[in-house]
Amino acid sequence: MKTLYKSLLAFVAWVMLSVSALAVDVIVVSHGQANDPFWSVAKNGVDKGCKDMGVSCKYTAPATFDMVEMAKLIDNAVSQKPKGIVITLPDAAALGKSVKAAIAAGIPVISMNSGSDDYASLGISAHVGQTEFEAGVGGGQKMKAAGGKKALCVNHEVGNVALDRRCAGFKKGFGGSVDILGTSNDPTEIQKAVAAKLGGGYDTILTLGAGLAGEAALKALEAAGKVGSVKLGTFDMSPGMLKAAAAGKVEFLIDQQQYLQGYLPIAIFGQYMRYGTMPAGVVMTGPGFVTPDNAAKVIKWAAQGCLLYTSPSPRDTTA
């Protein structure tokens, strides 16, 4: 009997140690998949932050842009009782209940990438990213200065409030006619949709993501022989769009530094676990602009999986 009792105690101790070893300090719930060119860079930042801070992390995301599934992932993260949760916040209305449940459970939450205008209303203390409307204003101002009169804003994630704000900011900065083209996130479909619009007198195109929409729009312009005559700019960066910028085919890429958006929340939680302190407000990682003048020096960083801040953006003091 004593032998059995000792064996049971040993088994319970082993289970407790195993659970402790499997416990996750920080869970990241993103709307972007780690195999997406943009989000793979953000995940690299998460991984490096976890290594540098000595914390265990888990990166999760729905298979597609799906707010119902993302809310379930946040709920699941809460049930695991981590020391912190990092989320993107593309739709505060859809995710608000789950975020508030995490905070009510005593789990601190940091938002990154999407959500600069909404994080505080949900009780989140800090956001890491760029202010989307202001970034759009800067892009619009650049296209206006380049002589643009009629623009197309290509939205590949319809329902993502952050992308809506990018287009709204672009429209304000541009000042001319701006139409919104809603698409799926399939590059082939985006290319076809942009190609179908090229006969509509557009002299300017802004895409809201480089790896999917930006490269697809560039292919449409190349196929139609309109590179240069139709100005193209994009949010975010990808190796293909960086090369296009270096070749003078793209007016600008708006760099929000997604590597830092992944890294900094983990670093913040690392310090929080040690000292109990956390910054408040928006920790700005962008926007910065990559242009044909500075694209070459940025390409070397892209090859290493991190895209770094390049230059300050124009500010719109009336926003």
Regions picked out by a protein language model, each given a short descriptive name:
Residues 19-23:
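Sec/Tat signal peptide C-region and signal peptidase I cleavage site
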Residues 53-62, 153, 173-187:
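Short beta-strand elements in bilobed, periplasmic/extracellular small-molecule ligand-binding domains
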Residues 309-319:
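Single conserved hydrophobic/aromatic residue that forms the stacking wall/gate
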Residues 173-176, 260-311:
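Hinge/cleft segment of the Venus flytrap/periplasmic-binding protein
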Residues 92-134, 236-251, 299-301:
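Flexible loop/hinge segments that line or gate small-molecule binding clefts
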Residues 75, 86-104, 170, 185-244:
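Hydrophobic alpha-helical
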Residues 70, 126-151, 187-191, 237-241, ...:
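Hydrophobic alpha-helical segments within soluble ligand-binding/sensing domains
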Residues 25-45, 49, 53, 58-74, ...:
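Extracytoplasmic "Venus flytrap"
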